[in-house]
Amino acid sequence: GKILNIKILDKTWIIQIKTSKKFNKFLVEKASININGVSLTVSKKKSKFFEINIIPHTLKLTNLKNLKENDLVNIEFDIFGKYLHDINN
């Protein structure tokens, strides 16, 4: 995925990430997602991107504090989203 935008709201980072459209079917709001090996929650899903929120404690303990706009990140989707897709198809 690609970092589109990083906003900081009360020390929490809100990051918008764009991914290939072919992977959108695996994104589920409130489900888990791994970004660069860190397990997080999808806070919002839109047609062209999704958002994650990162609290200060997580930023302190991970490599995510080094992210900036236009960076590429490794994404691993929650198995729940994959199962949901399979059930509906």
Model region roles, listed by residue range:
Residues G1-N89:
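Conserved loop->alpha-helix
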